């Protein structure tokens, strides 16, 4: 990610600082007394596998179509090398979950290297760390195998290993190797596996369930890619909602996200057809999500299936007694997550290496059940799941998947939260600045998904509008408990939804921090625990603000949703110095992409005169003043 820069004087963004007694423009006075408690979970993440954000994205495994899974297995991403042919073999299952393999038929007169390549997910990022590769093979073979990472166009080798291996036609043998790499200049790299054709003439070998990992985040087995994980860690979010989203619901009952098919050894995970146009391996499964939360200090928000698929697919919604097995499935999932190792599913979790229960306190029942024909039945379905879960786990906080009162039971059970999703235009986001000012404080809100939408990349106008909306949320963070921008990640080469918070390609160092990413980072990193009263002679618009404190530190967040600069003074009694972080561009259409980085935040140290900070807020800008 791009680090903040420190400037003085005019600087890169033409920031003007002066110490004066008064200014014309927006004058704010922050109270140092009292205030409302602010949710400690306010800023966080929503994740589902969209835009290859999981497979091919933050999930560290790099071989595409690695288990030849799905209802129509094919050779996507695979190609033959030398005197051999490859095909999908459906007759040599590794397990019930991995029924197919890649068959290599070596010609009777073969010479030279014979094998196959895999192109990864639109490339393979070779970062210079040690790589780990494993696969399963079957067939009568004894000899050398060579694994290489090689430039697709250049032929340059970035890592390789040659080793002796034997296998038989009786059963599969698992092969695991490690090898050093040198950093590749781009992601146009192939994984290549070959044998000596002359010594293996006429052989037929089957291979399946390939795994290729570089160094992972926190060195977790089957873990995350560090570059993307580090970008998220830098936001200092407080929660992770998973596994969706539409991908939780599925297109029908069969393709819903099935928690019990995402746990344990990879050879026992069949994967499922995702809702965003591609197959999900589920290598990033329930435990991996929870390790992600643990390693990044995030509170899990576990979504559970609630009897409804997208657009009422697959004879859903399911109601009445027909819901019983699905309620039992959720209770089994929660026992797996929360149960003591003496319980059936707690014991299963322990057998997979996690003895202690996971720290899960928030569970969301369904996803967007107000849409696609789910509303009419949701009150019944929510109540059935709520009662069963609450009876078994009374300390869990349960979240409804909508705030639409016509879809919810009346009254809503005490302690339940509601979820509001908001994809909108910039102007509409700004109009919603005060939408939570007068809501019922007895019903907490989760803003599970929001962003400006329908443009290729986040731009300054949209990001400032999001900041205005977020300021409105933070002002009401006694009742708004959590909020997450969505979607979170995007592989530029395979995209189903834009804009996205963080985009990436497989080229090294190609993590694209958007303007919206910087807004999220600025707001999340600079958080108080108490929202302070701010008085002003000015009305909100085009400048919007919120102030908070934590101990002796104060945070004032501002957004200028307009083309004119604004003179601002902020008075905080007792404060003498601070730091001003500003994200701005005079062009509201300015954006960062895979070909340009136009907008990054700048920081400057500022001094106060008698507790008053004065500065110029640029056009189309978001700013955070931190004072102490």
Curated annotation (Swiss-Prot):
Keyword Glycoprotein found: yes
Pathway: Glycan metabolism; L-arabinan degradation
Domain of life: Eukaryota
Principal location listed in the UniProt entry: secreted
E.C. designation(s): 3.2.1.55
GO cellular component, one term: extracellular region
Sites carrying sugar chains: 36, 51, 74, 152, 164, 260, 359, 404, 493
Any one Gene Ontology molecular-function term assigned to this protein's record: alpha-L-arabinofuranosidase activity
Catalytic activity: Hydrolysis of terminal non-reducing alpha-L-arabinofuranoside residues in alpha-L-arabinosides
Signal sequence region: 1-25
Compartment(s): Secreted
GO BP terms: arabinan catabolic process; arabinose metabolic process; L-arabinose metabolic process
Keywords: Carbohydrate metabolism, Glycoprotein, Glycosidase, Hydrolase, Polysaccharide degradation, Secreted, Signal
SMART domains: Alpha-L-AF_C
Homology family: Belongs to the glycosyl hydrolase 51 family.
Its biological purpose: Alpha-L-arabinofuranosidase involved in the degradation of arabinoxylan, a major component of plant hemicellulose. Acts only on small linear 1,5-alpha-linked L-arabinofuranosyl oligosaccharides.
Protein name per its UniProtKB record: Probable alpha-L-arabinofuranosidase A
Lineage start: Eukaryota, Fungi, Dikarya, Ascomycota, Pezizomycotina
